[in-house]
Design a protein with these regions (language model features):
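SDR active-site strand-loop-helix element
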Residues: 6, 30, 73-77, 111-117, ...
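NAD(P)H-binding glycine-rich loop region in Rossmannoid oxidoreductase-like domains
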Residues: 55-92
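Conserved Rossmann-fold NAD(P)-dependent oxidoreductase catalytic core, especially the SDR/UDP-sugar
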Residues: 75, 99-141
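Active-site YXXXK catalytic motif of short-chain dehydrogenase/reductase
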Residues: 93, 142, 146
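NAD(P)-dependent short-chain dehydrogenase/reductase
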Residues: 125-127, 139, 151-211, 238-240
Length: 309
């Protein structure tokens, strides 16, 4: 099987690529390295690595001419690093997704897409949120653009699976609270802890389910989540423990320091029905895997999709 992975140097894309190669599949990587990192590709054998933006129509032409067939597309590429960058969100998450969807139409192949839980807004009235809950992504430019991309896929007629995600963390996680905590603690800086909860789930668990989708399992939209949330302060304490510090770092606690909703829980019932869900890694395993990665490769910057006022 030949699988194209956009954002292949990112956290999700690189883990999926490694699992595909481990079972003998051929992988094509596309990444512009805006947030993906070259070291995430070190374990891959593939010679097909395109450093390009998915918003470039020339990439569409290049892939169309170079490959006679592509059996599946795993579309993880997204613009999220700057919550205020509307133009890049539109170019990458809307136009880029439309072009990738056209590519799936050309090759008549399955498309796997990844959506943010903020597609439901910042204060859904039902918890856990059911799949049929109305999409109203007004909380951020990122959510609006990702949802626009999802709508294009749905009206395109391609065979697709969309995973609407809880907070995916673990090795190679470079956005959100986990790498921020590690970076600030390592620098001797105070962390700011929000009075909020999030559903944290390991990227390695997600990657195994994505492989099932590549192989034809499922159809349409799914929640990838544990259905349980964790206080941000508890995640912080797990990070401190995993760093094996001989002191207790100071932190500031604020009601809603990071912005965003106090919690969004996603109902994973349909996912458990249609996929062979793995035993989910514990939060301790997930944090430990992330810290091991940071100790080896570092954290270069703090990344969030939330708007900065």
């Amino acid at each position: 099987m030949r699988v194209l992975i956009t954002g292949g140097a990112g956290m999700v894309g690189s883990h999926v690529a490694e699992l595909l190669e481990a079972r003998g599949d051929e992988v094509i990587i596309v990444d512009n390295f805006a947030t993906g990192r070259p070291e995430h590709l070190l374990n891959l054998r593939t010679q097909y690595k395109f450093e390009d933006s998915i918003a470039n129509e020339s990439l569409y032409a290049k892939l169309s001419s170079q490959f006679l067939n592509i059996d599946a597309i795993v579309h993880t590429a997204a613009s999220f690093a700057n919550g205020n960058d509307w133009s890049d969100h539109i170019n990458t998450n809307v136009l880029g997704t439309a072009l990738i969807t056209r590519l799936a139409q050309k090759f008549n192949c399955r498309l796997i897409y990844f959506q943010t839980a903020l597609c439901y807004g910042d204060n859904p009235t039902i918890q856990p949120v059911p799949l049929e809950y109305p999409r109203q992504p007004m909380a951020s430019s990122y959510a609006i653009s990702k949802t626009a991309g999802e709508f294009y896929i749905e009206q395109s007629g391609v065979d697709f699976v969309t995973f609407r995600l809880a907070n995916i963390v673990g090795p190679r996680n470079l956005s959100g609270p986990l790498p921020i905590f590690y970076k600030r603690i390592s620098a001797g800086e105070k962390c700011v802890i929000a009075n909020a909860k999030r559903d944290f789930i390991d990227v390695r668990n997600l990657a195994t389910v994505v492989l099932q989708a590549i192989d034809g399992r499922g159809n349409g939209a799914y929640h990838f989540s544990s259905g349980k949330d964790v206080q941000i302060i508890d995640l912080y304490k797990k990070v401190v423990s995993a760093m094996r510090l001989d002191f207790e770092p100071e932190y500031d606690f604020q009601e809603n320091a990071a912005g965003g909703p106090p919690s969004i829980l996603l109902d994973p019932t349909r996912t458990y029905s249609d996929f062979d869900m793995p035993t989910l890694n514990s939060i301790e395993e997930t944090v430990s895997g992330a810290i091991s990665y940071y100790e080896k490769f570092g954290v270069t910057r703090e990344v969030t999709h939330l708007k900065k006022n």
